[in-house]
Design a protein with these regions (language model features):
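Structural signature of nuclease core domains in nucleic-acid processing machines
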Residues: 1-248
Length: 248
Protein backbone atom coordinates (compact mmCIF):
# COMPACT_ATOMS: atom_id res chain seq x y z
CA UNK A 1 0.00 0.00 0.00
CA UNK A 2 2.80 2.40 0.90
CA UNK A 3 4.84 1.58 -2.21
CA UNK A 4 1.96 1.93 -4.67
CA UNK A 5 0.46 5.15 -3.27
CA UNK A 6 1.21 8.41 -1.50
CA UNK A 7 -0.43 7.79 1.86
CA UNK A 8 1.74 7.32 4.95
CA UNK A 9 0.72 6.31 8.48
CA UNK A 10 0.12 9.30 10.75
CA UNK A 11 -1.33 7.57 13.79
CA UNK A 12 -1.93 4.18 15.39
CA UNK A 13 -4.49 3.17 18.04
CA UNK A 14 -5.72 6.73 18.38
CA UNK A 15 -8.24 6.93 21.21
CA UNK A 16 -11.30 9.17 21.13
CA UNK A 17 -14.17 8.86 23.57
CA UNK A 18 -14.62 5.15 24.18
CA UNK A 19 -13.36 4.22 20.70
CA UNK A 20 -9.96 3.54 19.20
CA UNK A 21 -8.88 4.04 15.59
CA UNK A 22 -6.40 1.31 14.66
CA UNK A 23 -4.67 3.33 11.96
CA UNK A 24 -4.85 6.72 10.26
CA UNK A 25 -3.03 7.38 6.98
CA UNK A 26 -2.62 10.78 5.36
CA UNK A 27 -1.37 12.27 2.12
CA UNK A 28 -0.38 15.92 2.41
CA UNK A 29 -0.37 18.43 -0.42
CA UNK A 30 0.28 22.16 -0.36
CA UNK A 31 -3.33 23.16 0.31
CA UNK A 32 -5.02 19.99 1.51
CA UNK A 33 -4.56 16.76 3.43
CA UNK A 34 -6.23 13.49 2.42
CA UNK A 35 -7.06 11.11 5.25
CA UNK A 36 -8.19 7.48 5.43
CA UNK A 37 -8.77 5.11 8.32
CA UNK A 38 -8.21 1.38 8.63
CA UNK A 39 -9.67 -0.99 11.20
CA UNK A 40 -7.96 -4.35 11.72
CA UNK A 41 -10.23 -7.40 11.83
CA UNK A 42 -9.57 -11.10 12.37
CA UNK A 43 -12.81 -12.22 10.70
CA UNK A 44 -14.45 -11.75 7.32
CA UNK A 45 -16.40 -8.60 8.17
CA UNK A 46 -17.24 -6.41 5.19
CA UNK A 47 -18.65 -2.91 4.97
CA UNK A 48 -22.43 -2.79 4.41
CA UNK A 49 -23.90 0.61 3.57
CA UNK A 50 -27.44 -0.64 4.30
CA UNK A 51 -26.34 -1.54 7.84
CA UNK A 52 -24.84 1.94 8.15
CA UNK A 53 -28.10 3.55 7.08
CA UNK A 54 -29.99 1.63 9.77
CA UNK A 55 -27.37 2.56 12.41
CA UNK A 56 -25.95 -0.95 12.73
CA UNK A 57 -22.46 -0.55 11.24
CA UNK A 58 -21.27 2.96 11.98
CA UNK A 59 -17.77 2.30 13.30
CA UNK A 60 -15.71 3.13 10.21
CA UNK A 61 -17.42 6.39 9.18
CA UNK A 62 -17.50 7.53 12.82
CA UNK A 63 -13.76 6.87 12.96
CA UNK A 64 -13.18 8.81 9.75
CA UNK A 65 -15.15 11.78 11.02
CA UNK A 66 -12.99 11.72 14.16
CA UNK A 67 -9.80 11.42 12.10
CA UNK A 68 -10.82 14.39 9.96
CA UNK A 69 -11.25 16.42 13.15
CA UNK A 70 -7.81 15.34 14.37
CA UNK A 71 -6.17 16.36 11.09
CA UNK A 72 -7.99 19.71 11.16
CA UNK A 73 -6.26 20.39 14.47
CA UNK A 74 -2.90 19.29 13.11
CA UNK A 75 -3.17 21.26 9.86
CA UNK A 76 -5.00 24.55 10.51
CA UNK A 77 -5.81 26.40 7.31
CA UNK A 78 -5.66 23.32 5.10
CA UNK A 79 -8.63 21.51 3.59
CA UNK A 80 -9.01 18.02 5.05
CA UNK A 81 -10.38 15.58 2.49
CA UNK A 82 -11.84 12.25 3.70
CA UNK A 83 -10.47 9.58 1.36
CA UNK A 84 -11.69 6.20 2.50
CA UNK A 85 -12.72 3.74 5.21
CA UNK A 86 -11.32 0.23 5.24
CA UNK A 87 -11.33 -3.11 7.03
CA UNK A 88 -8.08 -5.08 6.90
CA UNK A 89 -7.83 -8.79 7.69
CA UNK A 90 -4.87 -9.55 9.95
CA UNK A 91 -5.13 -13.34 10.03
CA UNK A 92 -2.91 -15.40 7.76
CA UNK A 93 -4.76 -16.46 4.59
CA UNK A 94 -4.89 -20.13 3.60
CA UNK A 95 -3.96 -20.78 -0.03
CA UNK A 96 -3.37 -24.02 -2.01
CA UNK A 97 0.20 -25.24 -1.45
CA UNK A 98 0.42 -26.85 -4.88
CA UNK A 99 0.04 -23.52 -6.69
CA UNK A 100 3.01 -21.77 -8.26
CA UNK A 101 4.83 -19.07 -6.29
CA UNK A 102 3.22 -16.37 -8.43
CA UNK A 103 -0.25 -17.87 -7.98
CA UNK A 104 0.28 -18.14 -4.22
CA UNK A 105 1.30 -14.48 -4.04
CA UNK A 106 -1.79 -13.43 -6.02
CA UNK A 107 -4.02 -15.56 -3.78
CA UNK A 108 -2.52 -14.01 -0.65
CA UNK A 109 -2.99 -10.48 -1.99
CA UNK A 110 -6.59 -11.29 -2.92
CA UNK A 111 -7.32 -12.58 0.58
CA UNK A 112 -5.70 -9.52 2.20
CA UNK A 113 -7.40 -6.98 -0.06
CA UNK A 114 -8.96 -4.13 1.88
CA UNK A 115 -12.73 -3.90 2.13
CA UNK A 116 -14.61 -0.66 2.61
CA UNK A 117 -15.66 2.48 0.82
CA UNK A 118 -13.63 5.00 -1.20
CA UNK A 119 -14.01 8.65 -2.08
CA UNK A 120 -13.99 8.21 -5.86
CA UNK A 121 -12.50 11.64 -6.58
CA UNK A 122 -9.72 11.14 -9.15
CA UNK A 123 -7.14 12.85 -6.93
CA UNK A 124 -7.94 10.42 -4.12
CA UNK A 125 -7.76 7.38 -6.39
CA UNK A 126 -4.41 8.51 -7.82
CA UNK A 127 -2.97 9.00 -4.32
CA UNK A 128 -4.23 5.59 -3.17
CA UNK A 129 -2.65 3.72 -6.07
CA UNK A 130 -0.43 5.08 -8.82
CA UNK A 131 -1.19 4.07 -12.40
CA UNK A 132 -4.21 1.96 -11.50
CA UNK A 133 -5.09 -0.36 -14.38
CA UNK A 134 -7.67 -3.12 -14.20
CA UNK A 135 -8.61 -4.42 -10.76
CA UNK A 136 -6.53 -3.23 -7.82
CA UNK A 137 -4.93 -5.92 -5.66
CA UNK A 138 -4.95 -3.54 -2.68
CA UNK A 139 -8.21 -1.62 -2.64
CA UNK A 140 -11.82 -2.42 -3.60
CA UNK A 141 -11.59 -0.55 -6.90
CA UNK A 142 -10.54 -0.95 -10.50
CA UNK A 143 -10.46 0.86 -13.83
CA UNK A 144 -12.18 0.16 -17.12
CA UNK A 145 -10.25 0.38 -20.39
CA UNK A 146 -11.54 3.94 -20.88
CA UNK A 147 -10.00 5.00 -17.56
CA UNK A 148 -13.25 5.27 -15.61
CA UNK A 149 -13.72 3.41 -12.34
CA UNK A 150 -15.28 -0.02 -12.79
CA UNK A 151 -18.83 -0.74 -11.70
CA UNK A 152 -17.53 -3.19 -9.09
CA UNK A 153 -15.46 -0.48 -7.41
CA UNK A 154 -16.57 0.34 -3.88
CA UNK A 155 -16.27 4.05 -4.64
CA UNK A 156 -18.66 6.98 -4.48
CA UNK A 157 -18.42 10.44 -6.04
CA UNK A 158 -16.82 12.89 -3.62
CA UNK A 159 -20.04 14.74 -2.78
CA UNK A 160 -21.87 11.45 -2.22
CA UNK A 161 -19.06 10.09 -0.04
CA UNK A 162 -19.19 13.24 2.08
CA UNK A 163 -22.98 12.85 2.33
CA UNK A 164 -22.43 9.42 3.90
CA UNK A 165 -20.19 11.02 6.52
CA UNK A 166 -22.70 13.81 7.21
CA UNK A 167 -25.46 11.23 7.59
CA UNK A 168 -23.27 9.28 10.01
CA UNK A 169 -22.93 12.36 12.24
CA UNK A 170 -26.68 12.93 12.16
CA UNK A 171 -27.45 9.27 12.89
CA UNK A 172 -24.92 9.19 15.73
CA UNK A 173 -26.50 12.26 17.32
CA UNK A 174 -30.04 10.88 16.98
CA UNK A 175 -29.03 7.57 18.59
CA UNK A 176 -27.36 9.40 21.48
CA UNK A 177 -30.46 11.54 22.02
CA UNK A 178 -32.67 8.44 22.05
CA UNK A 179 -30.48 6.80 24.71
CA UNK A 180 -30.37 9.96 26.83
CA UNK A 181 -34.17 10.12 26.66
CA UNK A 182 -34.41 6.60 28.06
CA UNK A 183 -35.30 4.55 24.99
CA UNK A 184 -34.14 1.13 26.20
CA UNK A 185 -36.97 -1.16 25.10
CA UNK A 186 -36.05 -4.56 23.68
CA UNK A 187 -36.85 -4.09 19.99
CA UNK A 188 -34.31 -6.16 18.04
CA UNK A 189 -34.03 -5.88 14.29
CA UNK A 190 -34.21 -8.47 11.55
CA UNK A 191 -32.44 -7.82 8.25
CA UNK A 192 -32.10 -10.68 5.83
CA UNK A 193 -30.87 -13.66 7.85
CA UNK A 194 -29.38 -11.52 10.64
CA UNK A 195 -31.07 -10.31 13.81
CA UNK A 196 -30.09 -8.09 16.71
CA UNK A 197 -30.23 -11.14 18.98
CA UNK A 198 -27.57 -13.16 17.16
CA UNK A 199 -24.60 -12.03 19.27
CA UNK A 200 -26.41 -10.17 22.05
CA UNK A 201 -24.94 -10.72 25.52
CA UNK A 202 -28.33 -10.01 27.11
CA UNK A 203 -30.57 -12.25 25.02
CA UNK A 204 -31.24 -14.60 27.96
CA UNK A 205 -32.45 -11.87 30.32
CA UNK A 206 -34.03 -9.13 28.17
CA UNK A 207 -37.46 -10.77 28.06
CA UNK A 208 -37.80 -10.74 24.26
CA UNK A 209 -39.29 -13.99 23.02
CA UNK A 210 -41.07 -14.55 19.70
CA UNK A 211 -43.41 -16.96 21.48
CA UNK A 212 -44.80 -14.08 23.55
CA UNK A 213 -47.64 -12.02 22.09
CA UNK A 214 -46.43 -8.58 21.04
CA UNK A 215 -42.82 -9.65 20.51
CA UNK A 216 -41.64 -9.33 16.92
CA UNK A 217 -38.54 -8.17 15.10
CA UNK A 218 -38.25 -4.75 13.50
CA UNK A 219 -37.79 -5.72 9.87
CA UNK A 220 -35.19 -3.55 8.17
CA UNK A 221 -35.14 -3.21 4.40
CA UNK A 222 -32.04 -4.05 2.38
CA UNK A 223 -30.95 -1.37 -0.08
CA UNK A 224 -28.64 -1.04 -3.02
CA UNK A 225 -25.87 1.53 -2.60
CA UNK A 226 -27.86 4.02 -4.66
CA UNK A 227 -31.02 3.46 -2.62
CA UNK A 228 -29.15 3.79 0.68
CA UNK A 229 -27.50 7.05 -0.38
CA UNK A 230 -30.84 8.44 -1.60
CA UNK A 231 -32.40 7.58 1.76
CA UNK A 232 -29.52 9.33 3.54
CA UNK A 233 -30.05 12.45 1.42
CA UNK A 234 -33.75 12.41 2.28
CA UNK A 235 -33.05 12.08 6.00
CA UNK A 236 -30.61 14.99 5.94
CA UNK A 237 -33.07 17.17 4.04
CA UNK A 238 -35.91 16.30 6.42
CA UNK A 239 -33.69 17.27 9.35
CA UNK A 240 -32.84 20.62 7.81
CA UNK A 241 -29.43 19.89 6.34
CA UNK A 242 -28.45 21.22 2.92
CA UNK A 243 -25.92 19.76 0.51
CA UNK A 244 -23.16 21.51 2.43
CA UNK A 245 -24.10 19.70 5.63
CA UNK A 246 -25.16 22.90 7.42
CA UNK A 247 -28.41 22.87 9.33
CA UNK A 248 -30.93 25.41 8.12
Amino acid sequence: QLEKGDFVPSGYELKFGSGKIDRIDTCEEENCVYVKVTDYKTGMKSFDITALYHGLQMQLPVYLNAAVHVEEQRHPGKEIVPAGIFYYRIQDPVVPAEDSEEAVEKSILKELKLDGLINGDEAVVAHLEHDLSGASVLFPMGRNKDGSLSKSSRALPRETFETVLKYTKEKENSLKEAMFEGEVQAAPYEMGESTGCDYCAYRDICGFDLRIDGCSYRRLEKFTVEEAVAAMWLTLEENGFGSGGEQG
